[in-house]
Amino acid sequence: MSPAPVVAQSANGHSPIVGEPEVLEDGTVSSRSVESSPAWLGLKEAVSALRPLQVQDGSIPGDADHPDARALVSTIAGHLRAFVPLFPHDADYLNAAAIDFERWASQGFAVPDFFDSLEAFQPQRDRVDGLRHLVVFPMYTQNGSTDRLVEAVLVEVIWPEFVAVLEAGDYSNRLFVPIRFLDFTDGYDTNSAVLFPETIAMRTVPTFTWGAIFADREAARFRRVVREASAITKLDLPADAARLLDDQHLAEETFVMWDLIHDRTHMRGDLPFDPFMIKQRMPYFLYSLEELRCDLTAYREAVRLERAEDTDDVTRDHAKLVQYAVLFDRIFRFAITGTRVRNYDGVGGQLLFAWLHQHRVLHWTDTRLIIDWDDVPEVVIALGREIEELYWQSIDRPKTAHWLAAYALVSTTLTPHPASNWARVVDGRRDLPLDGPPKGFTDAVLPDEFPLSMFYEALSKKMADVIDSTAGLTGRG
């Protein structure tokens, strides 16, 4: 039997929004099948043909390319307007995007400015499970394309009922939009798993905006990487963890719960700095601690929800799974994914592994990984408390003193590079420009300040092909 439609009133005044299933009355292409329709394929083809004409900043400087570019932009704008009946909740955005494309062409394809259409795109207002969006912007993709080329993406909202209840209660996060891929252009055939407004070409960045995370990509690469890593390390997976690796849908919902709590944590707690750390230049291990703090907060809250007597069965089950997801993604995927150049997520994964090992709840013995599961929660939560204590104390510290204290926290557990000036102490003082501006501190951080341990060096070699295979991965494969 088909599920009953999920209906919600749109916050922007349009007609009610219908989630799964959604079928147009005239029997033509519906948003349920749009990814295989000639309309979408035509739009995708036009976008893909336009991209090679652009340069890094998104402009098209070659006059000889302008006739072709104008024809492609005309096709794109026409498709955007034609999609309005399929995506009535995005009507304002689709029309505004068509206008932005046409303005870009009429102004000679200078650096694109899609601020107006970005302002019209408000997916956080309509978080309905199964609701679909068509997104077309000139943009770079985080951990993907560094050029602001036009991208076209079809996405679907993931908003299970238990997450809606959590968000309406203690875990409010009104700008958080979890989504899954339906189809995309080349900028997302990469490791990028986010859609953030600040990546879009525009004249100014809005102050507060939504953030979308591709939970299907997160879940799919987690399942592939952890399955391989657990086999290599001969880790005996608990039944619930194995269930998570076997079920993409369950993994997606688990990552949505994790991301919901992680994302809101950036704005909460005793913060000694502006929450928008991305705008600040500082030693990259500060980012390691902030991202890890948010993940460990999600872990701690998952433990609390699992243990609370009034937690419903569905939420309790997912809370248990969030704990496995945070732990395994951090120690198996984060630590060995990406280059060793200022890899702040890598350092966070290394730190969690070493912390667990040095607190003797994780063991690498006889070439087998063993985890004392009953003791893990308190040890993980203790690391979170260490970071929170650092933050609380640093409210009263100057910036560089906070940086030094943060380095001490990390280097107590992770061994720095032997050539590190940060680690070297001369005449009782760190070998840093202590009397100079903060820039000198940041410049002194090595690109790989905390190299991989011998355990991780060996694991990364065995895992390299699997890690590489996750680029472009979605819940569909």
Predicted regions, residues:
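An active-site-proximal "capping" alpha-helix that borders the catalytic cofactor pocket
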Residues: L286-R304
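C-terminal interaction module
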Residues: E156, P160-Y188, H359-L452
